[in-house]
Amino acid sequence: MKLQDNLKSIKKELERIKVENWSKENIDKNTYRYIRLFDIDDSLMNQKICFFGWVKSSRSSSKISFIELISQFKIIKCVIPTKVKLTDHTTLKVWGIMKPNNGNDEHQFEIDVQAYEVYGGYQAPSFPLNIHSDKDTLLDLAHLGLRMPHRILFLQAQNELLKALRKFYWNNNYTEITPPTLVQTQVEGGATLFKLNYYDQPAYLTQSSQLYLETVAPVVGKAFCIMPSYRAEKSKTSRHLSEFTHVEAELVDIQFDELMDQIEQLIRSTINEFYKNILPEIKKIDNDFQPVVLSDKQFKKITYEDAIHFLIAQNHKKTDNTDYQLGDDISDASEKFLLETYGENQPIFLIRFPTDHKPFYVAKDQYGTQTCDLLFPGIGEIVGGSMRETNYNNLLDGFKRENIDHEPYSWYLDMAKFGPSPHGGYGLGFERLLMCLMKYKSVDQSTLYCRKPSRCTP
């Protein structure tokens, strides 16, 4: 009975949203040139064209209707010489003639509609989202949220940031690779691994592509990848995801200071290129938006030890309200405090962490570990990097220290035998950087479909 009631309800809804196509009399649709909406411009003035789009807005009076159609971020104004009722997001195929725009709006031209068809015969139901929808509803209906202006802007911003990153790498002779995401090794600690059965063998979703980049870098000199990584952390902060886009690079024949210079160049170049392309689109939605502006001064550096002493001197407490001591992890809130005070709201490198704070592969010199985290205003860490250990025995000691069986890493250990060289690399959290640049409140907003402990859908 319940199934029958549901079917009746669906049938009733379909009848409600069913809509008739419309056409002027005696038009020959074969005389209209088909063109994609994105390619329509004023060079087609007075020409007959046919195109396809989605209703962005619709208003009508007793004798005329104004419809905005959207596709590929472009909006076209259509004028229909009769009253029609079309819901937002309904799909239309339109036959019309381009005319000069007679309205007081931003459109350069308008389409005098001669006919339209509703694709599938049904217009879209009432849209279930609006600017007042709560966070969970927006995440539950993220597939529909992509039709909203702020999420359309997100898609544009995501695309522009990926382009800006790749432009830096390609302009600086990096080689892009596509390493595997099913692995039998760990990089960041076994507690954060997603384990799965791989043809009756244990395997994991990758935490990082670093080890594979290290095998490629000796061949190409500089390698990078932009791939998903996975962390089984039950963290509920605004900057953590269980699946995220990991921008990683590895460079050979490089020293520690050069590595940090490369990271800084990447950040500066990417931000400049990103805003150059996306800022006009942001301003259309938020005219008061202020982009991130970096100082011309080189990013400051502070050692882990000096940072702890600085926090103590500033009477800045840990999350449990006790004093910091050497050996403590520096919390997210304390990273932000360092940025605001020591960093003067500019990015800073936090460097030379204790050995037991970093994985088996990090290299050391007389000053300590050659490690760096780039902290960024508003969020904290966005990049983690280090020089890599190249001595075979030191690597074995690192595995032993972390209680890791080195046998699955035999291929990685070969790198220490077959022509090792000074090399280093880093990983950048793409969603974190996008969150900073777009002034989002959470990485949930800077990912297409959020994946975290409480969410694996849609």
From Swiss-Prot:
Keywords: Aminoacyl-tRNA synthetase, ATP-binding, Cytoplasm, Ligase, Nucleotide-binding, Protein biosynthesis. It catalyses: tRNA(Asn) + L-asparagine + ATP = L-asparaginyl-tRNA(Asn) + AMP + diphosphate + H(+). GO terms for biological process: asparaginyl-tRNA aminoacylation. It is an enzyme of class 6 (ligase). Its EC number is 6.1.1.22. It holds the Pfam family tRNA-synt_2. One of its GO terms (cellular component) is cytoplasm. GO terms for molecular function: asparagine-tRNA ligase activity; ATP binding. It is found in: Cytoplasm. The keyword Ligase applies. NCBIfam families: asnS. Belongs to the class-II aminoacyl-tRNA synthetase family. This is Probable asparagine--tRNA ligase, cytoplasmic. It comes from Enterocytozoon bieneusi (strain H348).
